[in-house]
């Protein structure tokens, strides 16, 4: 059995990690760490765990993670790297769900976040986008779990970038997310009366995930590229739907795209290519799947891609567990086979 600790276990992502790991046949949770819920049991703070688990939250101390083989760190950027360093120093595999270990370019990270305190650890880390970076994940002690928006966008674009089928500076990503992506901390802007029956764009031209998407897309394309990314907030709890536009550099039709995407993702269980219809949020809600569909606008020779994920699962906790499965040589699907919550 793999022994797991979760730091930052009382937030939305932390609780989702607990829920998913409890159903994993090869994992035992040995500690759940949260200063805000210290000494409370999970079935008291989250009654959905009644008769399932009575794990007790505790404050962080090295002893709390000493028994673990893997440490999941679900803390905000900046704070997280301190705990990742501690876990690394005592020989633990650390899967970090903040932005702190997603970048290879320190300047990109510093521009959108802050100066990294442990830049030497970036060379020890792998970007945890499972379908793209599997071999690096297998060999890394620190795995930087991708952001939710980047997961949806990069996987939607990867086959076209790898095959150099689009104009590298024509990419526009228009993503819509459920409110859980903002986290558990209260903010009036995310309150019911502000969101219900509303729909809005935010952080236009300056969302932090833009640089993460650009860095990874540039790697796939083999050259630096610039793109436009605009996030929107939907009045739903969970899910991301990205509509991605790019100019094709040669004449190809939808049948060609079906062949290209199916070939690129032929061995990827969690990627579902929609050939005859377009994905919807309800198909992926509660799952680790990425649903991808597309059309070609023949008038403009532009491709339009639809990419859907559950932001808390494939965009966070589920992908972190998929990374753990890869790292510990388990079946990648273990603990993650789920049918979407249709209603």
Swiss-Prot record:
Its main location: cytoplasm. Catalyzes the NADPH-dependent reduction of N-acetyl-5-glutamyl phosphate to yield N-acetyl-L-glutamate 5-semialdehyde. It is found in: Cytoplasm. GO terms for biological process: L-arginine biosynthetic process. CDD domains: AGPR_1_C, AGPR_1_N. NCBIfam families: argC. Pathway: Amino-acid biosynthesis; L-arginine biosynthesis; N(2)-acetyl-L-ornithine from L-glutamate: step 3/4. GO terms for cellular component: cytoplasm. Keywords: Amino-acid biosynthesis, Arginine biosynthesis, Cytoplasm, NADP, Oxidoreductase. Its EC number is 1.2.1.38. The active site is at residue 148. Belongs to the NAGSA dehydrogenase family. Type 1 subfamily. One of its GO terms (molecular function) is NADP+ binding. It catalyses: N-acetyl-L-glutamate 5-semialdehyde + phosphate + NADP(+) = N-acetyl-L-glutamyl 5-phosphate + NADPH + H(+). This is N-acetyl-gamma-glutamyl-phosphate reductase. It is an enzyme of class 1 (oxidoreductase). It comes from the Bacteria. InterPro entries: AGPR_AS, AGPR_type-1, NAD(P)-bd_dom_sf, NAGSA_dehydrogenase, Semialdehyde_DH_NAD-bd.
């Amino acid at each position: 059995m793999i022994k797991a600790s979760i730091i930052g276990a009382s937030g939305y992502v932390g609780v989702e990690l607990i829920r998913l790991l409890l159903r994993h046949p090869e994992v035992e949770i040995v500690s759940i760490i949260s200063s805000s819920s210290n000494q409370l049991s999970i079935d008291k703070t989250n009654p959905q765990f009644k008769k399932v688990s009575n794990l007790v939250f505790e404050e962080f101390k090295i002893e709390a993670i000493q028994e673990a083989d893997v440490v999941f760190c679900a803390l905000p950027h900046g704070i997280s790297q301190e705990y990742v360093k501690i876990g690394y120093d005592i020989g633990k595999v650390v899967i970090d769900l903040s932005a702190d270990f997603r970048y290879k370019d320190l300047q990109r990270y510093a521009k959108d976040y802050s100066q990294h305190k442990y830049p030497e650890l970036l060379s020890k880390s792998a970007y945890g986008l499972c379908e793209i970076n599997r071999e690096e994940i297998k060999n890394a002690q620190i795995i930087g779990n991708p952001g939710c928006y980047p997961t949806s966008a990069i996987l939607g674009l990867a086959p076209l970038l790898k095959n150099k089928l689009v104009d590298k500076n024509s990419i526009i990503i228009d993503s819509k997310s459920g409110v859980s992506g903002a986290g558990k901390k209260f903010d009036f802007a995310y309150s019911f009366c502000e969101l219900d029956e509303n729909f809005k764009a935010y952080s236009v031209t300056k969302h932090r995930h833009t640089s993460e998407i650009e860095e990874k897309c540039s790697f796939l394309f083999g050259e630096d590229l610039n793109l436009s990314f605009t996030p929107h907030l939907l009045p739903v709890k969970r899910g991301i739907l990205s509509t991605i536009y790019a100019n094709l550099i040669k004449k190809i039709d939808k049948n060609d795209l079906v062949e290209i995407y199916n070939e690129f993702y032929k061995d990827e269980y969690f990627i579902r290519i929609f050939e005859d219809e377009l994905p919807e949020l309800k198909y992926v809600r509660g799952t680790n799947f990425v649903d991808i569909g597309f059309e070609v606008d023949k008038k403009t020779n532009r491709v339009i891609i639809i990419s859907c994920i559950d932001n808390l699962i494939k965009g966070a906790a589920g992908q972190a567990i998929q990374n753990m499965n890869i790292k510990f040589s388990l079946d990648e699907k273990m603990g993650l086979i789920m049918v979407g919550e249709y209603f």
